[in-house]
């Protein structure tokens, strides 16, 4: 018995040591050590490289200044690095200065966008209805139409979910009722009850001849799924791939993650929001207390827009694969509804920060109330200034953040912004029962945003994201009630709560300096 136990322990240790995440981490550390050794060697020859380093720093600084689409925080962080380490900073910038995906991926995504453009059907009646209903919101919708690029959709019923478990309960019958296709895209897929039930339905539907496709992010699932999980799904008839495979090479392209969460059934029903496909998101397992999330269900033409986003990604992966928009995106049946919706996607491929610009629009058009749920609050100057100004002009601005952190360093960084906001009159609440993962906005009880976008640099500049704007309708009452419940279970943050002492303040300042570079 003891011998068998030792073998079991040894097998587990070997599996851990040679696991993909450990091997990748070790190789990355070795490359970091090599870079450090190179920089140390360059320091010994500073007198030979000094002039070259200064010239390189000047060129890099001028190049940064010319980039009008680059946020000032990003420029400042790099310029400080150039000043401290002229030669080394220039090398690092050449390696990691461009936050966009690799050139090949950019070109494939751009071609896929063009290929899927004919399937994005405008709804002139919905656009006209929004113009009559809310002219200011119609301007935001026009921006999204041109740069999202996604139209406003009428005839789309929307249902809001205040947690992952209620959303999951509706996912299962929708999946079981699929007749044509199922598309699933998720940042995280974790083995357990949630994914187990979904996967079994997908397997059955694929066996019945339906078009079943799955996209998952490789980094998000690095420690959760076997490295060949996409191949394993393909043996079940499920077409699948992992996005942006993690390789043990130090480059910023690995930061471009697919953070989207989309499920589309028959092009008619769609789910999206903050909920990944793992058990903590439906509170079957406890990680950081109660996991508070949000999501939305669309039925009608708005679901087809999310299918378009999914298939654009698919087309980028398989550019030579024929994609008949009329077949793969059947016309959605309009539903009786009292709201308009506008799903949209954001991508680091271009230099258009769509999600950030939409959020700036929502802040600037708020007249009475602006309520925001976000798990992370790492703001650039544009967002920080707009939130402060909104509070100063009399808008009731409330921000709900987690009381229990999932990442202590990010939690510290989030709280470093609290004093600036509180002094301007913004109210901040800390959700005490657990981790608040919802990404929900409510503006004047007339517009809501529900999706995957966090208020941090990674979501706004590095990740592939998606969200839905909901204009009017009774569904906004459900959003408002959920936010009221969150506030009841939260503690109001005061300036006294934000005192960290000299070293805490210094630590936060360093974190804010490096945040744009990560």
What are these regions (language model features)?
Residues 428-432:
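Active-site donor-binding acidic/aromatic loop of nucleotide-activated sugar
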Residues 187, 376, 410:
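Glycine- and other small-residue-rich loops at beta-strand/loop junctions that grip anionic moieties
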Residues 385, 411-415:
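Short glycine/threonine-rich loop-to-helix capping motif typified by GTGT followed
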Residues 1-357, 361, 365, 405, ...:
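N-terminal localization/anchoring segments of enzymes in phospholipid and broader phosphate metabolism
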Residues 376-397, 402, 407:
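Helical hairpin unit composed of two closely spaced alpha helices linked by a short loop
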Residues 439:
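Catalytic-core elements of nucleic-acid end-processing and repair enzymes
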